[in-house]
Structure formats: structure tokens, C-alpha cells
Amino acid sequence: MKPLHSQYQTPDISLPFRQLQKHIPFFHHISKQYFLHHISFCFSPYRKINNNLEQQTQAYFDELFVVNADPNWPECTLANIGSVVAGGTPSKSKLEYYADQGIAWITPKDLSGDKSKFISHGENDISELGFSKSSATKMPAGTILFSSRAPIGYIAIAQNEVTTNQGFKSVIPNKNIGTAYVYFLLKNLLPTIEGMASGSTFKEISGTAMKSVPTVMPDADIIQLFSDFCEPVFKEQEVLEAENKHLSALRDSLLPKLMSGEIDVSELDL
């Protein structure tokens, strides 16, 4: 059986516009509005498949660790599940602390604008010098980024080595725990974490409080069962998100050309 994403062909934005026509199932003689509407329509299959996969994995987590949770599983805290890591911000007044292609540096704003499950870079990267002059910490791929303030609870999975600003209390999963379990565990614990937050201006969960969030330690074989189930699903979701971003880039590259009249779609034979 072909991977789900292979059922849909993604346009290559490097192709000449005439060649792009054959990739997109539009009708003849269309308006700009109709053209843009159908580019937006192309996002739908990827989103639906991705959402369905997310619902399946969430349901399996609930089945294993909520509905059928073993009352004999020992109590523990997040500190027993993985390493809780804070972040830092290099001085904004030092331009040399930032780079176009440097160390990935994520802020809550990056997660608010991009609802993807996986993230590789934010709007800005920092330089090695900026990293050395801040309290930012390098975290490996598979780390679960968790925003700790304004708001609490943005969650994403690092696709590569990343750093964050101080608006995160991220979790590097222990090797015997794995990314998938910690990702869904944090989603499940969000009400508890919000209840442990404090602050007069805005609520924030401190590093100490985050480490002390209560949970349980399921049997290792159950965690492994869940990890094995999630591994191919997560890989599929990464591909779907990449293809969705590719379509977004296509739309964004064509929009100004359509609006300026550089591209005329009214007489295209699609």
C-alpha cells in the first residue's frame, strides 16, 4: 500500500508556471479568485490526513495510559520522565549574536504562527557567539518544546538540534521513554501544569514547578508498544507537514504575480 501522502502530488514551485498547470486539477478559463481558491483547496487532503493520524495516536494514548492505566504504576514526576530545560535570549542589541543560517532558536511566537507538530527553525537563528553569551541550551532532535508562559502549552517536536528563548520549559525524553509518550503526556498534563503556574502579570510555570509535575511511570513494555505504533505515524506526519508548507510557498510565490498581472490565468487551458 502506498503511503497516504503519495496519493497527492505536490507541485514543484521551481517549475515554470506553464508546467505547474498540469499538477493542479483546475477547470478551463478561470479567474484569479477561482485560481487562488483551488490552490487553497489543495491544502485540504494533507490537513485531513494529518488530523486523522493525530486523532488515531491520541486515541491510542488514551486507551493505553488513561482508560486502561494500571493503578499499580508507580507515582513519579516529570523530572523522572526526562530533563526539563529552560532557554535564553541573546542581547537584541548585538547584531552579531544573530545569524541568517545559524543555530535554530525558537520562541513561543514561532509556535503561535505555525501550528505544525514539528519544527526545525524559528523566525530567527542565533550565532555561536550569541549562544555562548546567553543561557540558551542546545537540545537534540526529539525534544518536546513546551511554552511556559504567554501562553502556557504551545507544544512542538524538534526536528533537529534547537535552542529556545526563556519562554519554554522543554523536555528531553529519557531514552527509555521516547518522544511520542512525552509529547502526548504533556498534552494530557496541560490542565495540571496550568494549575501549578503562578504570576501576577501573566501565569508562568517555573522550572522547579515543571520538574515536580506529578505523573506515573507506566511499564516499559507499554511505553515501547506506544512508541513503535507512533514511529511510522510521526514520520508520515512530518512528510505531510513538509508538503503542506511546500504548497503554502507555492501560493505565496504566485499571489503577488497574480495581483500585479505578471501572470494572467483568465485564458489558461487548465
Tell me the role of every PLM-derived stretch.
Residues 25-26, 31:
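Ser/Thr/Pro-rich low-complexity tandem-repeat tracts
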Residues 6, 16-18, 31-33, 38, ...:
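Non-catalytic DNA-recognition/assembly elements of restriction-modification systems
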Residues 1-21, 25, 76-218, 269:
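DNA target-recognition domains and sequence-specific DNA-contacting regions of bacterial/archaeal
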